Design a protein with these regions (language model features):
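Solvent-exposed, non-transmembrane regions of membrane-associated and secreted proteins
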Residues: 1-207
């Protein structure tokens, strides 16, 4: 949901801070673990509500709208989508690659259960601060859990990848659904979550 009492200048400061952070990742492209200092900075970015939510992901083709939390703790993944903390924040820009993780097949929540129904050419949107970032799916891969090469930043590209376990119920591999940034067609709007995410409370994902 949009946070009131933030003006355009403050939004721009928030965007700049997140983009600066993403630029810093380019100097450490193969670091998969953040330092304590990096973790503190990371957790503070895009968290205007003070509840760990950095935005929302909308996937129209499978009727999904879920909050995106900092990090991929199990307490997050049980009820929402988590952002891999060593990847780019979801603010777009050339030389960025945001990776979002979600569970499938949980009895209590749908989450990324229907991700396998998506196909190349479908779109998904990230609602972040006062903007919408739209991505068109251009690649769907099935990989071993330890294969992180497809998640790395590609110079000059603006990418976002959704990741979940597969095959359904076995979970021996990972499905990577990647999109490249395209022009958004819709205006930012108030977010109203009525499905899985309604159960989320800040204390459930507190450190």
């Amino acid at each position: 949901e949009q946070v009131a009492n933030i003006d355009d200048a403050q939004y721009e400061e928030l965007w700049d801070a997140a983009r600066d952070y993403n630029q810093s990742l380019l100097h450490h492209p193969n670091d998969f673990i953040l330092s304590d200092e990096q973790q503190e900075i990371y957790k503070s970015l895009l968290d205007i509500g003070g509840n760990g939510i950095m935005g929302y992901i909308e996937i129209p083709m499978i009727d999904v709208m879920l909050p995106i939390y900092h990090g991929t703790k199990e307490s997050v993944l049980q009820i929402a989508v988590g952002h891999l903390d060593w990847t780019s924040l979801p603010v777009g820009g050339a030389g960025s690659h945001c990776v979002l993780s979600g569970h499938r097949g949980l009895p209590s929540a749908r989450l990324f259960t229907d991700l396998d129904k998506l196909k190349v050419g479908d779109v998904f949107m990230l609602h972040v601060l006062n903007e919408i970032l739209t991505y068109e799916i251009d690649q769907i891969l099935i990989v071993e859990p330890q294969d992180t090469d497809p998640l790395l930043i590609e110079p000059g590209k603006d990418l976002c990848t959704m990741i979940t376990c597969t095959p359904y119920g076995i979970n021996s591999h990972r499905m990577l659904v990647r999109g490249h940034r395209i022009e958004s067609q819709e205006e930012p709007k108030d977010i109203r979550i009525t499905a899985d995410a309604v159960r989320i409370e800040p204390l459930m994902v507190a450190p």
